Amino acid sequence: MNTHAAKQQKHIDLFFQTHGPRYLNMPPVMEYVTEWRIREAMKRLDAPKSSKILVLCCAEAHEASVICDMGFTDVTVSDISTVALDLALKLDGRLSGRILDAGAIDLPDDSFDVVVLQDGLHHLQSPVGGMVEMLRVARRAIVFLEPHDSVSGRLLGRKWEVNDGEINYVFRWTKKLVQNVAYAYFAHDRFKNLSFSFCHHNIVYDRYFRFLGVAGLSALKATLDFFLGRLGNQFCGIIVKPIPVERDPGVV
C-alpha cells in the first residue's frame, strides 16, 4: 500500500469510528437523489440479475444495498478500510466483502462481471489508473459515478476536497475522456460507451423538495436532465466490453 492509500485508509477508519454510518437517518431528498444515481446507472447497463458484481470504495455500502434491492443476487463490497467494510457487512447480510485498494486491485483479470464505484476515483492519486484497474477486473462492464467536467460542475463543485487534513483534487470526467481511456486500454473500438451526465445538487434539490415532495422533485429532475443533462454537474461512466468471440480452432 502506498503512502497516499495509507492516509486514505486512516481517514476512512477514523470517520466511521467517529460517525458511524451516514445513511441510516438520511433526509428523504438525499435518499432519493443518492439512490437515483445508482439505479439509473444499473438500469442503463441492463446487466443480468445473476451478474457477479464488485462494488469498490464501498464505505458503509449503501449503493451496494440498492443494487441488491434491484434484484442482483451476487454482490461483493470492498474498501481499503476494515472499519468501513465490517460496518457494511453488519448493515446488510446480503453482501460479501473483502479488503481491496481501488488503485491497485489485488484480483486477476475478469474476476467479476461488473465493477462499480461511486465517488471514489477522485480519492486516488491516479483516477485514470483506477478506471483502467476497473476495466481489467471487469469481465463485462464498469460503472462509476464522479463529478462532470462542465461549467456547472466547476461552478457548483470544488477544486479541492479536504477531509480531516487530507487533500484530494476533485478530478472531473467527460464522455470523451472515458472513450479515450477505453481506446488506449483495449486498442480497439469494439466496446460501448454508455456514459452520461446529469444534474445533481443536494442543497438546490432540498429547497425544492420542501414544496414539491418526492413526486414533484422527480418530475423536476427528469425535466432538468432531459434539457440540461449534457451540461449537468455529475457524471456516470459506463463502459461495456465486447462479448468475446469464440475463435474457430481451425482458423489460423
Go through each PLM region and give its residues.
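Short, glycine-/aromatic-enriched active-site segment of Class I SAM-dependent methyltransferases
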Residues: 147-168
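Class I SAM-dependent methyltransferase SAM/SAH-binding core
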Residues: 55, 60-104
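Conserved beta-strand signature within the Rossmann-like core of class I S-adenosyl-L-methionine
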Residues: 139-147
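A C-terminal cap/extension of S-adenosyl-L-methionine-dependent methyltransferases
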Residues: 192-252
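Short alpha-helix
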Residues: 170-189
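Conserved class I S-adenosyl-L-methionine
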Residues: 1-46
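A conserved beta-strand element that flanks and buttresses the S-adenosyl-L-methionine
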Residues: 116
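A short, conserved alpha-helix within the catalytic core of class I
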Residues: 124-133
